């Protein structure tokens, strides 16, 4: 019985680490991009985080690129999981794995297949958990 109590207490303390995080709700402009040299760089199959894109089905990777201010001001980090809403077709869970050009502010880019053309949404909501220490 004591062993079960210890395991249960350990699980509770592990779960409580999520209490040390605060929810960020940020409204951004969202656009799409393709893994092509004209829109990225000469290593279009590798993101800024070093993640290798599934070139046969880039949408399956659920990758977004974020503007620098989302990293520096709002605490977004490479590998973070975010929930995006306000686009309709692209709403859902995405992973921060790429970075946009410094000229963009409060903006995300969805990595999509080349067959998907056009796409710009205003006032897209991103829900993101960040550590309270940032």
Spell out what each predicted region is.
Residues 9-13:
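Residue-level signal for alpha-helical transmembrane segments in multi-pass membrane proteins
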Residues 14-134:
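Solvent-exposed, well-ordered loop and adjacent helix/strand elements within mature globular domains
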Residues 1-7:
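Sec-dependent signal peptide recognition
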């Amino acid at each position: 019985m004591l062993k079960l109590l210890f395991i249960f207490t350990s699980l509770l303390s592990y779960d409580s680490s999520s209490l040390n995080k605060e929810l960020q709700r940020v409204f951004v402009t969202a656009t799409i991009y393709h893994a092509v040299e004209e829109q990225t760089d000469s290593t279009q199959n590798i993101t800024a985080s070093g993640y290798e894109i599934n070139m046969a089905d880039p949408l399956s990777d659920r990758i977004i690129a974020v503007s620098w201010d989302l990293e520096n001001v709002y605490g977004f980090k490479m590998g973070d999981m975010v929930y995006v809403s306000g686009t309709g077709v692209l709403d859902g869970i995405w992973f921060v794995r790429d970075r946009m050009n410094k000229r963009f502010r409060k903006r995300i880019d969805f990595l999509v297949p080349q067959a998907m053309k056009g796409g710009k949404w205003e006032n897209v909501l991103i829900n993101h958990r960040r550590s309270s220490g940032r």
